[in-house]
Design a protein with these regions (language model features):
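Active-site microenvironment of metallo-dependent hydrolases
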Residues: 3-38, 42-43, 51, 87-89, ...
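Residue-level marker for buried hydrophobic side chains located in beta-strands
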Residues: 64-66, 126, 260, 455
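Active-site mouth loops of central-metabolism enzymes
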Residues: 66-78, 133-146, 212
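Divalent-metal coordination cores built from histidine and acidic residues
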Residues: 83-190, 486-488
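Short, ordered loop/turn segments at secondary-structure junctions
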Residues: 98-101, 129-130, 166, 196-197, ...
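Short acidic, glycine/serine/threonine-rich loops at helix termini
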Residues: 105-109, 135-141, 172-176, 202-206, ...
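Histidine/acidic residue-rich metal-binding segments in metalloenzymes
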Residues: 143-162, 169-234, 239-260, 270-291, ...
Length: 560
């Protein structure tokens, strides 16, 4: 039994902070789609009164931003540190899926995220991960069955059923999965989707199960079909998947069906901006300002039934102050009347944390990475910059001393995935698109089961990058013979327990080294992390071998 405790922030913990005051300016009322001059009276963290009257101040007071779908773990920061960075950009709440830590630590991991998030003045709304592990073709640290989900959905700290990735299971009515969906319906909690490229009758069956959103659309036509069936579309702009440009035309035709999200945001990018970046970009393209601001806040609040203030009397005093509502940059961020950030500086203190983890991988050796030549073509994963999907093709391999090696001139590199929960031999395949000319990259952030994934030019490079990561019991590493960078992630092998700004700087150094090694990818470590995600087409790699997503089966690396 997992026991959840009340959020002290929503109770008495922060009562000593000054959360009663009056503030005037141009009030942006998204609920009624209007802007007026007035004064907001805040009493004990609540909006006691809004008086419409002339004021001399030209600043704008508007609802804070909401990230409608994010895996906090992908920031490599614990929730309390994620909040410190996010509030500086006007974010007051997140709809958070603890799927990553659940794959490592199960319900204990979910509880860790909830309890750590309660330490700071920020509104985290966590869901119950629906697919842990996401498939049966990989090794994970834990699993959540229907009984676990029923227990979680009964908790007041769980607000929705997280993305249902197993769309074949929905279509074919897998009993265990349907029980999870039924548990969400029983407690009247929304059900999030995850159905890239799903169309036609299969999509209709998926939606008819009660699934209400999708953040995996990367084509406009796909999104329009899903909207026609009643789904809400989350426009995603993260560190790996960037679908804003393809989907933003929906703002002109279906603004009430849209929300903004980041999904996965690495720490250096979170330091630079969050949902506010999407808001400014959308407005700069000429879309209706009110529609854009609603996609960044009100639409998510209504869909997920969040207790986030929308500048209405009786609401929590959750709002931001900006100089220009057509290009909003948060000068002040308030949550429950508490000034949590001002002029880009957070007023949230660093919180110490424990470092729960499971990491039992052994150091690897050169012969573990040997791939014998069989006189056949090999299948190659082709990563796509800015997308989670991959392409695939076959080619003649480069062979040295009877073994297949990386073909640097053609950008075909060796990629490996290693079980980190039990000692096991690496699974080895080949990938195009990373562009490394020397060295190797490794990560224990490897969606969804978070085994070790690495890519490199030589077996020696891969070996050193992986063993450096194992030495730290998790993290990301960039290695070459002359320099190396490691960012330790001791919390579940996913998150750091250090100051968020220091983590962002360290990760930026690792990314910089990856690019000096030759990678042209926008976010090489984020792209690497998704090369083991078996629920997104077309060809991926698990710790058990190469995986053909269209056939939903492990396959040989050799042409068959």
């Amino acid at each position: 039994m997992v026991v959840f405790y009340p959020n002290p922030y929503l109770c008495a913990k922060f009562e000593s902070m000054n959360n009663s005051f009056t503030i005037g300016g141009q009030i942006v009322d998204l609920v009624n789609s209007r802007i007026f001059s007035g004064v907001v009276v805040v009493n004990d963290g609540k909006i006691a009164k809004i008086e419409e009257q002339p004021v001399g101040n030209t600043r704008y007071i508007m609802p804070g931003f909401v990230d409608a779908h994010v895996h906090i773990e992908s920031s490599m920061l614990i929730p309390s540190e994620f909040a410190r960075l996010a509030v500086c950009h006007g974010t007051v709440a997140t709809v958070s899926d603890p799927h990553e830590i659940a794959n490592v630590l199960g319900k204990d991991g979910i509880r860790y995220m909830i309890e750590n998030g309660k330490k700071v003045p920020f509104k985290f709304y966590f869901g119950a991960p629906s697919c842990v592990p996401s498939t049966a073709f990989e090794s994970a640290g834990s699993s959540l069955d229907a009984n676990d989900i029923e227990e979680l959905m009964a908790s007041p700290d769980i607000y929705y059923l997280s993305e249902v990735m197993n769309y074949p299971g929905v279509i074919h009515k897998d009993p265990n999965l349907m029980r999870k969906i039924a548990a969400a319906k029983k407690h009247d909690k929304p059900i999030d989707g995850h159905a890239p490229t799903l169309t036609g009758k299969a999509l209709q069956k998926y939606v008819s199960a009660g699934i209400t959103t999708d953040h995996e659309c990367f084509q406009l036509e796909e999104a329009l079909e899903k909207i026609s069936l009643g789904m809400k579309i989350l426009i995603r702009e993260g560190s790996a998947a960037r679908n804003f440009d393809a989907l933003i035309p929906l703002m002109a035709t279906h603004p009430d069906k849209l929300m903004f999200c980041s999904d996965d945001k690495h720490p250096d990018e979170l330091d630079d901006g969050h949902i506010d970046v999407l808001v400014r970009k959308a407005i700069s393209l000429g879309y209706n300002v009110m529609d854009v601001l609603k996609a960044a806040s009100l639409n998510a609040v209504r869909h997920y039934n969040l207790n986030v203030g929308m500048l209405q009397e009786g609401d929590d005093a959750d709002f931001i102050v900006v100089d220009d509502f057509k290009s909003p940059v948060a000068r002040q961020t308030y949550i429950k009347g508490v000034l949590v950030a001002e002029n880009g500086v957070a007023n949230i203190k660093y919180e110490e944390t424990q470092t729960p983890n499971i990491f039992k991988a052994n150091f690897i050796h050169a012969d573990d990475l040997f791939v014998p030549d069989k006189g056949k073509k090999i299948k190659v994963i082709e990563c796509v910059d800015g997308q989670l999907i991959t392409n695939c093709f076959t080619t003649d391999p480069k062979v040295v001393n009877g073994g297949i090696v990386s073909d640097v001139e053609n950008d075909i590199l060796k990629i490996v995935v290693i079980n980190r929960y039990h000692p096991a031999k690496p699974a080895v395949a080949f990938i195009k698109g990373f562009g490394l000319r020397r060295g190797a990259l490794a990560s224990s952030v490897a969606h969804d089961s978070h085994n070790i994934v690495a890519v490199g030019v030589t077996d020696s490079d891969i070996l050193h990058a992986v063993n450096l990561l194992i030495e730290h019991t998790g993290g990301v590493t960039a290695y070459c013979s002359t320099e190396m960078v490691a960012v330790p992630l001791p919390v579940a092998g996913l998150m750091s327990n250090e100051d968020g700004y220091e983590v962002a700087a360290a990760y930026e150094n690792a990314t910089a080294l990856a690019k000096r090694l030759g990678s042209k990818l926008y976010a090489p470590f984020m792209t690497l992390a998704f090369m083991a995600l078996l629920v997104i087409p077309e060809l991926k790699l698990s710790d058990r071998g190469l995986f053909d997503v269209s056939k939903f089966a492990v396959c040989s690396i050799y042409e068959e």
